[in-house]
Amino acid sequence: MMPVDDLQEIPLSKDTTEKSKHTVRAAGAVLWRDASEHGGTTGHPATVEVAVIHRPRYDDWSLPKGKLDQGETEPVAAAREIHEETGHTAVLGRRLGRVTYPIPQGTKRVWYWAAKSTGGDFSPNDEVDKLVWLPVDAAMDQLQYPDDRKVLRRFVKRPVDTKTVLVVRHGTAGRRSRYKGDDRKRPLDKRGRAQAEALVAQLMAFGATTLYAADRVRCHQTIEPLAQELDQLIHNEPLLTEEAYAADHKAARKRLLEIAGRPGNPVICTQGKVIPGLIEWWCERAKVRPETTGNRKGSTWVLSLSDGELVGADYLSPPDEK
């Protein structure tokens, strides 16, 4: 088991209820834009501006956030809430931790991400009547809630402008022992196909651009809906199968780094006996400690890179699991 990063694992505020009746899931973001055109280094914390919103209902200044809609994952909700509250589209990056606090219904749990604005215009609405873009120090003063300020401090603690590599374990595909044909051709089952469809919005929230899959039908099928959405081909990767990894893990590592070094945000879909070893090796190499670990079918590792170096590794459960 890889060590846990204390910075990310500890909730920003603790639930003080003895027994929660219900957990309300929500997601939010530090929405940022580059202000380097005014003089500075692109993506440096000192030259970015972050969005702080005013909600007339509460008369407060806070970060964009909101509850999940039915069937949504936290990353999808974060991207949607950003657009609804600020008018901006955005690409998610590093996960910044979670806030939990008691509410009358039980407990509210909010996961936050860094989110780079890709454009848009704010229009006042019933939920948000003002938006200001501020340097980090000024935003820290503007935010009213201590938890929001803690999230913002986490945002600037590590590189702001990052590239993302998305490593996906293929969706469910029945049991190997029950499949009579060539296991390389074993397809996704009904749940696996649903996972593949649900992964589209989640992977697009992180700006997925290029697609790679281990040489297995189920790996290709897992990202086929995304390939159709992006109108992209899926590159076949023989070096990233379980058998190839067991035979030559160094070749698989080299291939992973080659893909990560290419332009864009790649999605790499592979198998359950490949992912843990690759993630652990890269994290140890970069001295990155993931907040949580996992390897469920349909799950995703969101790997954040800055100047080619791994700076964050976030595990996301399958989209059909809470």
Swiss-Prot record:
Stretches the record annotates as Disordered: 1-21
Positions annotated to bind Mg(2+) 1: K65, E85, E127
Pfam families (alphabetical): His_Phos_1, NUDIX
PROSITE patterns tied to this protein: NUDIX, NUDIX_BOX
Top-tier EC class: hydrolase
Phenotype upon loss of function: 12-fold spontaneous mutation frequency increase by rifampicin resistance screening.
Enzyme Commission number(s): 3.6.1.69, 3.6.1.58, 3.6.1.61
Domain (Nudix hydrolase): residue spans on this chain: 22-156
Cofactor binding remark: Can also use Mn(2+), with lower efficiency.
Keyword Magnesium annotated: yes
InterPro entries: His_Pase_superF_clade-1, His_PPase_superfam, Nudix_hydrolase, NUDIX_hydrolase-like_dom_sf, NUDIX_hydrolase_CS, NUDIX_hydrolase_dom
Swiss-Prot/TrEMBL catalytic activity: 8-oxo-dGTP + H2O = 8-oxo-dGDP + phosphate + H(+); 8-oxo-GTP + H2O = 8-oxo-GDP + phosphate + H(+); 8-oxo-dGDP + H2O = 8-oxo-dGMP + phosphate + H(+); 8-oxo-GDP + H2O = 8-oxo-GMP + phosphate + H(+)
Record: residues binding substrate: R55, P56, R57, Y58, D60, K65, G66, K67, Y101, K108, E127, Y145
Gene Ontology molecular-function annotations: 8-oxo-7,8-dihydroguanosine triphosphate pyrophosphatase activity; 8-oxo-dGDP phosphatase activity; 8-oxo-GDP phosphatase activity; metal ion binding
Top-level lineage group: Bacteria
GO terms classed as biological process: DNA repair; DNA replication
Cofactor(s) named in the record: Mg(2+)
UniProt key word Cytoplasm: no
UniProt keyword terms in alphabetical order: DNA damage, DNA repair, DNA replication, Hydrolase, Magnesium, Metal-binding
Regulation: Ap4A hydrolysis is inhibited by fluoride ions.
Domain comment in the entry: Contains an N-terminal Nudix hydrolase domain, followed by a linker region and a C-terminal histidine phosphatase domain. The C-terminal domain is necessary for efficient catalysis by the Nudix hydrolase domain.
Protein's name according to its UniProt entry: 8-oxo-(d)GTP phosphatase
Taxonomic lineage of the native organism: Bacteria, Bacillati, Actinomycetota, Actinomycetes, Mycobacteriales
